A protein has these predicted regions:
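Alpha/beta catalytic cores of group-transfer enzymes, especially the acyltransferase/condensing modules
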Residues: 1-139
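Acyltransferase/transacylase module recognition
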Residues: 103-182
Length: 182
């Protein structure tokens, strides 16, 4: 955890960036708009639920994306108070540093499936878990797919640990009957 935090802080200083929540526009349109911004880095970074995606990238790239996405019909484009462009190519220096630390750490075969947001899939293989932990720094968070896969695999109860109930709200938007608590 400390190695990841230090690597990400260093990457934020090396490659300043930010993130913004885009509300009320379909994922494909957000992807399309981000792809046409050529001179700056901006990508969909968090697929939270249908109609709610967070974009991440350079300061100028996110600013341009917010403007274009509002013009394309987004209900809201809200800049987030974050320290960097997480889950984007701007985190590549952190990914390189974290890869070394993870590769030098022994992982055992999982005794239960772990859903990793980089793919949304359940895994138990130490090699796949390691690869996904490394990839998550520069790859999008596929929370929508993660929720869908958990539900398909029989999820019935969700206990949210930590402050707030953000994840419970996202699960409610799936329209699936689940027992939610924190």
């Amino acid at each position: 955890v400390a190695a990841r935090a230090n690597a990400m802080q260093s990457a934020c200083e090396e490659n300043p960036g930010t993130m913004a929540a885009i509300i009320g526009l379909d994922n494909e349109k957000i992807e399309e708009v981000c792809a046409i911004i050529k001179d700056e880095i901006v990508i969909p970074a968090n697929y939270n639920c249908n109609g709610q995606v967070v974009v991440s990238g350079s300061l100028k790239g996110v600013e341009i994306a917010c403007q274009l996405l509002k013009e394309a019909g987004a209900k809201r484009a809200l800049p987030l108070q974050v320290g960097g462009a997480f889950h984007s190519p701007l985190m590549e220096p952190a990914r390189v540093k974290l890869a070394e630390a993870i590769q030098n750490t022994k992982f055992n075969e999982g005794i239960c499936p772990i859903y990793q947001n980089v793919t949304g899939q359940a895994v138990t293989s130490p090699d796949i878990i390691k690869a996904n932990l490394i990839s998550q720094l520069t790859a999008p968070v596929r929370w929508t797919q993660t929720m869908e896969n958990m539900i398909v695999n029989g999820l019935t109860d969700v206990i949210e640990v930590g402050p707030g109930t953000v994840l419970q709200g996202l699960f409610k938007k799936t329209g699936t009957e689940l027992q939610l608590s924190s």
